[in-house]
Amino acid sequence: MAMDEYLWMVILGFIIAFILAFSVGANDVANSFGTAVGSGVVTLRQACILASIFETTGSVLLGAKVGETIRKGIIDVNLYNETVETLMAGEVSAMVGSAVWQLIASFLRLPISGTHCIVGSTIGFSLVAIGTKGVQWMELVKIVASWFISPLLSGFMSGLLFVLIRIFILKKEDPVPNGLRALPVFYAATIAINVFSIMYTGAPVLGLVLPMWAIALISFGVALLFAFFVWLFVCPWMRRKITGKLQKEGALSRVSDESLSKVQEAESPVFKELPGAKANDDSTIPLTGAAGETLGTSEGTSAGSHPRAAYGRALSMTHGSVKSPISNGTFGFDGHTRSDGHVYHTVHKDSGLYKDLLHKIHIDRGPEEKPAQESNYRLLRRNNSYTCYTAAICGLPVHATFRAADSSAPEDSEKLVGDTVSYSKKRLRYDSYSSYCNAVAEAEIEAEEGGVEMKLASELADPDQPREDPAEEEKEEKDAPEVHLLFHFLQVLTACFGSFAHGGNDVSNAIGPLVALWLIYKQGGVTQEAATPVWLLFYGGVGICTGLWVWGRRVIQTMGKDLTPITPSSGFTIELASAFTVVIASNIGLPVSTTHCKVGSVVAVGWIRSRKAVDWRLFRNIFVAWFVTVPVAGLFSAAVMALLMYGILPYV
């Protein structure tokens, strides 16, 4: 059959296929390196370079088998024997519908499934062309089932692996020995799965036809050699690196403790009475007496009683005014009487009282000290700023947030917060005492006008309920330095593995219809008996990489950071288990969604780490998008198919 008159559709198909590959790279690239970028083991530029290499390699070696499912497994191509041009127009329509919806989703930073798009688009044009009889519904049912199986299976595998790692490595007092013992196993498992995938799926491309047992034996042998190499060279090097890092951090910690001890010995803990501090009866209220007394006193406090320090109380503002700084470096809140009858003051950092305060808090801590109060002490010592020690004296809660991206401003923002009050002074000059006093004054006035009870964060909860230590929550969200080193390169390796699997699976979403279009044009029929050309797979890989570099960062933010915090240890389990699921599915020719596998793994591991770590609202939106994608892509494809069938083909 002469097909030259339809050459225009082939040319149009190549253009649209590249746009479709671009959209796949812009949206689905977050499945490969999103978690690696989110955990900080690679930068965005490094992720793009690595992904470009492994996406292209995976598309060439693994993409052929899944491409066959996309081309011939969803619709019955034999029904188009007499209307070849209709099938060609349908393939073009499928690519247009899928590309348009994925570009829209990428613009909206919404991670969707490229597999969903192409399947929905294929069904859409078939319904317009020959109705429901053109769809192989049983194959569609299997594909739909895989959409649910893939996140559940990937999530289960990731969760199981993470639980084992947490029990045997992360929760140990010294995680290094077990971590080093497990490194060869982790590397061997990663390499074995990767080699098996290449040998099994890519063997025909490489000109190798081997039985299953031979492929398994080769994969196992390569994995053993790699494990031996890791045990012989990588583990000793990693042990030396971790030991050196821990020794360096230990030395810095000792220097910090010695500095504090010298400060405490240099000043005797004698607190002076502050002028300008008045109680309701106009009598002067001293900040404190001897070292054993509290920071605030009242008439109701009997001699010899020692209430806890002010930073451990729930305090409320009733009335008062703010005075300007006093010459001796103090700052008085004249008449600020709290609900407990105490009067509290702000002192200057250079007045000498700050050192006494440090000593007071240090000796006031007992073995029964609550975790939240312990956290306040660490916060005070770490920040050494006006905000922190004022919080300790005046009962104002402090939430310190540091922007790692701005190394020049490690104390970029500190907030004074109440139940409904939030005051933030960006880039506050802590060496300027007056600017700090203004910040405190504004927070106090805001609390006065709103009638808000100002409380310490440690006292906001019910005192009868067990308190959660913010420091412990932060520790739970981050890996220890030695654990970070153990899993750093391992997550990079698994991310490359995931990118390889992504290229093998998702290149078919972009190139499957183009391959069908090309083979129909070359053979003059719909049978498509020839193998998938390698150069077409490479063409799709180039398009995916282009989309990654231009627009990939938009969805990386959603997958790598917004859904749940990622650490190297959790990222490793997410990458390995989800990539394993995708590779297995690719090898059996089942078009699973890499988005579903990765989302399932991220949510499962995040939920196991902490019930509060997962953004369930975002997960709900993603879950809804899974169902919306198929009909929306189908509608776009059906509209284009109707235009081609009834508006263009009859006149060509």
Swiss-Prot record:
Effect ascribed to mutating E575 to D/K: Abolishes sodium-dependent phosphate transport; no effect on retroviral receptor function
Stated consequence of mutating E55 to D/K: Abolishes sodium-dependent phosphate transport; no effect on retroviral receptor function
Stated consequence of mutating D506N: Impairs phosphate transport; no effect on retroviral receptor function
Inducers of expression: Increased by phosphate depletion in osteosarcoma cell lines.
GO terms classed as biological process: monoatomic ion transport; phosphate ion transmembrane transport; positive regulation of bone mineralization
GO molecular function: phosphate transmembrane transporter activity; signaling receptor activity; sodium:phosphate symporter activity; virus receptor activity
Gene Ontology CC, one term: plasma membrane
Known partners and oligomeric status: Homodimer.
Family to which this protein belongs: Belongs to the inorganic phosphate transporter (PiT) (TC 2.A.20) family.
Name the record gives this protein: Sodium-dependent phosphate transporter 2
Species the sequence originates in: Homo sapiens (Human)
